[in-house]
Amino acid sequence: MSRVLSAIVGAGTTADQGADPPAPARATVAEAAPAYPEFRVEVERFADVRILRYRVPGFEALDARTKKLVYCLYEAALCGREITYDQKYRYNLSVKRTLEQIARSYPGDRDTADFRALTLYLKRVWFANGIHHHYGHDKFRPEFSASAFAAFVRGTPAEFPLRERQSLEDFIAELTRVIFDPGVDAKLVSKSADHDVLTSSAVNFYSDLTQPEVEAFYAKQAVEGAEARVSLGLNSRLVKVDGVPTEQVQKVGGRYTEAIERIVAWLEAAALCAENEAQHAALKKLIRFYRTGSLEDWDDYNIAWVRDTESHVDVVNGFIEVYNDPLGMRGTFESVVSFRDPEATRRIGTIAAAAQWFEDHMPFFGRHKKESVTGISGKAITVVIESGDASPTTPIGINLPNSDWIRREHGSKSVTLANVVAAYNAVRGGVDREFSFGPAEIQRNERYGELAATLHVDLHEVIGHGSGQLERGVGPLHETLKNYGSTLEEARADLVALYFAVDPKLVELGLMPSVEVGYAAYDQFIRNALLQQLNRVELGKDLEEDHMRNRQLIAAWAYEHGLKDNVIERRTRDGKTFFVVNDHAKLRSLFGQLLRELQRIKSTGDYAAIRELVERYAVKVDPALHAEVRARYAALDVPAYAGFVGPRLVPVLRGEEIVDVRIEYPDDFTAQMLEYADRYAFLPAWN
């Protein structure tokens, strides 16, 4: 056991069981008072991204026990970070570790075009948790040559992750094909209706299986008509063993055990520092899930986690979101460690308290509304650290758990990541002004845009995802709507937020000063969906990512259905295209109509209807408009994406006792990634 973990748990506690976490950086009491220079939010740019930092206001005010709790959860989060790499692609860890060895140890000339290009490629791999773009899902195209790569490997005096009995030359040849051949595993996640989505996707959730084989396998496991069912496949990889589909479960003693044992050790330590019994019970149930791999235990944990609404500190840790699975079943590892932001929580808490009113006033068919909304809680959080699929890019809002039956019977938690949103707002620049048409739209956005965006996230997470109900006997989205389920669910939640954005109820609740805030939200959404988000797609490519598809589905559908009344107008000025909302009230009506239809599709499992909507409105891009948007962004010099360097927590020791935890704000992305690679590389390169 590491000295720091021993200082938290003491000898002979349950956290002694399992693997020893690595010894973290630590400080003595004399070193515990850092002096920070002026805080820079943006610290670096490369490729199509910029690297930001966020502050963690309020951390220093936490008491010592709470800081120890946060520190244990921080370590548990980072111990699982490399699981995400392997889940996304079977070669990610071998490529990543090879490039890291070159970056650390190559003794030759580093001031060459090839070495600079290799360094850039490695940064992109770190940013995406793999060799495919984190948003567009296309494989990166290296700007260094295959021969240069081979020379770098041969010339670096370091150990590389060779397979058993593999020669260095064979290893180089294998990775060269993976990195440089554009036809090999070109797309991380393919959701095209024209192909088998499994055989055309590089993601590492399945091996040697077709989409029909997987669907048949889980159809046999599903209980006909059951409503309270586990999330089949969530924490496993499905492979063929002797021709039979077999799940490799991710748990202690199973797949990824080397990392999961460390996660469990730190969660055990965290449980000893728990704030209250509810938090302690939830952490113990999470530990049990990691030990057993049982999805019933996962449900038990989620129920306990939803019930813990009083704790100041919170954590998401597990196999959570299913966006990286083309079938929408398997969760990618992520963790978010946070504590409550009391000031911002008052706003989101007001929305949560009115959840029944919102449900009653949904434009759904009556049978698709919940008669009684249960256990909706909402808060704004201050993020301490994120890892796995939540880092370096991060959500700005979270609503969990994803299980419909747990939401219905036990409720859900919704959070807004307040300090992350603040960091984004600090670097917004002139993008909104570039794509806004006239003075009224610009002034409205400058006055209300930040509040409009915040309320949209709150309504999306707190009300949107938790709204509505399935008709009796209808299965979960991955069974009924398959590869279109995630797009529908994100569109449904966005439409809920949009539908209520201009409702006077928000003024009555004190959430906004006037419906002009809602008008700003409509302007923002249409600008982003029909113009701004196109900057995130390479020319000639379709939309693949679920959030992008959802936005274009909504906006393109509303534009087409409002043409007769000129609700949204396409205008041109100085050779630039704009989409202008002329009638916000009629646009709200259109949003309500589409929301009713999407809820009907979800509630009834109408696959044909969602396929028609997505393929008609959400996939294809106007090539001329696409090129125009890319050119306008290039002139602005604003990268399409942003991610974060995370804070570092350093335990402060007096002898063997932790007396404090210090927070530091690193500003070097490469240094942090190499530090993480040194401290948290628990998994074999080949799994």
Roles of regions detected by a PLM:
Residues D63, N276, S486-D503:
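An active-site-proximal "capping" alpha-helix that borders the catalytic cofactor pocket
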Residues E277-K284, Y301, G475-E479, L506-D523:
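Short, glycine/acidic-rich hinge or "gate" loops at secondary-structure transitions
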Residues G468-A491:
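Post-HEXXH active-site segment of zinc metalloproteases
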Residues R55, T84, L498-L598:
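Long, well-structured alpha-helical subdomains associated
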Residues L120-G243, V249-Q443, G449:
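Contiguous, non-catalytic segments that form substrate-binding/exosite surfaces or channel walls
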